[in-house]
Structure formats: C-alpha cells, structure tokens
Amino acid sequence: HKIQQIVNSYKEPPYTSTRYNEIPLQDNMKISGFFQSYKYFNFCRDEILNLFQVCDPMEQKIINNYGMYLDSNVASIHVRRADYLKFSGHYENLGISYYKKAIDLFPETQIIFVFSDDIKWCKKHLPSFGKLNIYVEGQTDVEDLWLMTKMKNNIIANSTFSWWGAYLNKNQNRVVAPTKWFGPKRTADNSLETKDLYPDNWETI
C-alpha cells in the first residue's frame, strides 16, 4: 500500500483551553492537541468503555483486596498534590476545603476510597470528616484507574487522571468536580471555564 503524505494539519488552541472547538476534518490530516473536552469523543463513549479492560490476574488482585466493599455505597476521592504543589499557580490548589464540601454532600454511611500521590497527607486530614476511609496503596496507576471506575460515586480533582476514572465509570454514578481547573498563572481567556470540560450531569463546587 502506498503511504499517503499528510497535507493538512490542525493544532488545538493552548492546553489551558477547555472549550470544545470543532475540528475542520479533511483527508490526509494530522491533528494535535490536548482536546480536554468530552465532546470530542462522547459519541463513541460506549465503545471506549468496552475497550477499557484489565487482564484477569490484575482484576483478580484488585477484587481480592477491595472486592468486599464494591457492592456497598462506595465513592472514590482523588487528591493530587505532589506536582501541583511544585507548579503552584499553574493549577488550582483545591485544598482541604474543596474535599470537605464534596464529602459533606454524601451520607455518613458513605465509604470513601482515597486515591492520592500523597496518602500520608490524606491520612492526616481526611479522617476528621467522619466517613469510613479506605486508603488505596501499593497499586499501579492502571489498577487505581480501574478501581475508580468500579465506584458508585466519584469525587475528582482537577486532574485528567480522576476525570477519566469518573468518565469510564459504567455505574449510574454521582460525580463531584471542582469549578476551577487551572490556577491564576494560566492566562488564557477561557482557562477558568469548565462548561465543555464536564458532562452536564456532573456537579461542580
């Protein structure tokens, strides 16, 4: 087969943009960007959900560790700190207040699975909220992501990692997300907009 030369290209606006911009598709086209809106691919969400699978040994490992909770009223909470603290101002520092407001939306019987790159900080601050917290440790990123998709509800950070954990969740779940995504050093005129970032049924605080 003859390899066709790419003759057209499209580059998305800077990655601080969360607006959906319709791509002017043409033949032999290269597209590049972050495309941080579900509207680019929501039409094939069912296909994406079916594609996201883990191998049997990995699934069995996770079920052995946490399966006893998954039929209960469980929610994930993702706390991202390490690199966001390093690049303070570029990303919104959600702080403890965001997580408290989010957790308070759920009943006292809610079991919280905590995912974080700073579990030590979470163990120090989150227990004061009165929920039963299960701190997820010793897993790979793929295992964490897959486990997030098995929750009944998701509380996400301003992070595409937990965004995908919620989006790939097949449950009829409740998703709580932060209103602010980028920090003040991101100067794009639409950097604080999230209308195209989150599906309509997600709650923002």
Predicted segment positions?
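Secretory-pathway luminal glycosyltransferase catalytic domains
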Residues: H1-T109
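Leloir-type glycosyltransferase catalytic cores
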Residues: S9, Q26, P184-I205
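A generic alpha-helix propensity feature with a strong bias for hydrophobic helices
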Residues: T16-S17, D27, Q110, G130, ...
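Donor-binding and catalytic core of enzymes assembling or modifying cell-surface/extracellular glycoconjugates
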Residues: I103-R186, S191
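Non-catalytic N-terminal targeting/anchoring module and adjacent flexible stem/linker
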Residues: H1, A177, W202-I205
